[in-house]
A protein has these predicted regions:
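Class I S-adenosyl-L-methionine-dependent methyltransferase catalytic core
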Residues: 1-175
Length: 175
């Protein structure tokens, strides 16, 4: 729940087109968790998850109108590139991220995948390793209904908050 709270705190930065630097991110995380990373309450990989969750919230709020305004998925890419460019690069890893092999789908690849899949409202989209929901939100914007799965406990909990209408399963998708 604290990661989600941090994402909500970061969303206005994205809405204003303001960069989320390390100090802004640290402030949001400390406010949401009530403690610093030095205390062990959170790590930087969790902070990056909060940034991705803020992107999901941004896309849910503005994604459809941005796509309409852009006219095509290809024309949407530069707009989304500007949003993603406001976020810090993910330079730090955690033991959990290595153990679960957590690698986020870049939004440009997500747009390509959703476009290639030609998702319609009649499609049910399975996201077997949904992470923070970056690919799932694009499928949702395209009109597909979602089936979400995430093994990692923190990310599964975050998905439940980001996609409250969708159940989140916790199977090992690698098996």
């Amino acid at each position: 729940a604290a990661v989600h709270a941090a994402a909500i705190l970061l969303l206005p930065q994205l809405e204003r087109g303001q960069r989320v630097d390390a100090s802004v991110l640290r402030s949001a995380m400390e406010s949401a968790f009530g403690a610093s990373d030095a205390s062990g309450a959170w790590d930087w990989k969790t902070a990056y998850d909060a940034c991705e969750a803020a992107t999901v919230l941004f896309m849910r709020k503005y994604g459809k109108s941005l796509l309409r305004r852009a006219g095509s998925p290809a024309a949407l890419l530069p707009l989304l590139g500007k949003i993603v460019g406001l976020l810090p690069t993910q330079t730090r890893r955690s033991e959990e991220s290595q153990a679960f092999q957590q690698f986020s789908t870049p939004i440009s690849l997500g747009i390509a995948a959703v476009t290639a899949a030609a998702i319609t409202p009649t499609d049910r989209v399975l996201e077997p390793s949904a992470g923070t929901g970056l690919l799932a939100i694009l499928a949702e914007i395209a009109g597909g209904s979602l089936v979400l799965n995430e093994l990692a406990e923190l990310r599964a909990g975050l998905l439940s908050l980001l996609f409250p209408a969708e159940p989140v399963t916790r199977f090992d998708a690698a098996q």
